[in-house]
A protein has these predicted regions:
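Gly/Ser-rich "nucleophile elbow"/oxyanion-hole loop immediately N-terminal to the catalytic nucleophile
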Residues: 1-23, 33-34
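Extracellular/periplasmic catalytic domains that process cell-envelope and extracellular macromolecules
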Residues: 10-12, 34-35, 54-58, 119-126, ...
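Hydrolases whose catalytic domains are alpha/beta-hydrolase-1, hotdog thioesterase
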Residues: 27-31
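A conserved short beta-strand
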Residues: 37-48, 61
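Active-site nucleophile loop of the alpha/beta-hydrolase fold
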Residues: 43-51, 67-70
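C-terminal catalytic histidine-bearing segment of alpha/beta-hydrolase fold enzymes
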Residues: 63-65, 81-82, 94-167
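Acidic catalytic loop of the alpha/beta-hydrolase fold
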Residues: 70-73, 137-139
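Conserved alpha/beta-hydrolase "acid-adjacent" motif
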Residues: 71-83
């Protein structure tokens, strides 16, 4: 798909991002694992990473947003899906980020949101996790410090090119 699009349109091959909701988020994680040479950074909303054994050659920045009461893809995982924390731990370890996050909390329309930043990874990549307390399986409409989910995702992804954080 990337080859087809790039043959018909002028794209910046150093800034190819994958994002998705639910099953689309699983695809984004799969692309990060199996097409690591093409995908710059990924965003997962209410998704999970399946067990992967990709051939990773470079760090991949990840933003993950998930509700703690998601009844479709449980926050704590189950026999079908990895937990959010095990997914984050995979990328924290691979990207060599800090293991102790910077944590901020925020409330919007009665929903509490915890933001975890794991920074200082290889190539200056980071992992960001937005934990929506009592949030369900959704593309969240609540804002975090004035940014909705789409803005959070884009503002995270667009900070990176294939070589890491853009100066």
């Amino acid at each position: 798909m990337i080859d087809d699009i790039s043959s018909n349109y002028n794209i910046d091959s150093e800034r190819v991002y994958a994002s998705g909701y639910s099953n689309g988020a699983m695809m984004a994680y799969g692309l990060a694992n199996y097409k690591n040479n093409l995908i710059t950074a990924i965003a997962s909303v209410s998704g999970a990473m399946l067990d992967c054994a990709g051939n990773l050659s470079r760090p991949v920045p990840v933003i993950h947003l998930h509700g703690t009461t998601d009844g479709v893809i449980p926050f704590n995982g189950n026999s079908d899906y990895n937990s959010v924390q095990s997914t984050l731990d995979y990328w924290i370890n691979f990207n060599n980020t800090s293991v102790n996050p910077i944590i901020n909390t925020y409330s919007d329309q009665g929903l509490n949101i915890e933001h975890y930043l794991y920074d200082n990874g290889d190539n200056n990549v980071s992992i960001e996790h937005y934990k929506y307390i009592d949030g369900g399986h959704e593309w969240f409409i609540n804002s975090f410090q004035g940014q909705n989910t789409s803005e959070l995702v884009w503002n995270f992804l667009s900070k990176y090119n294939i070589n890491g954080l853009i100066d």
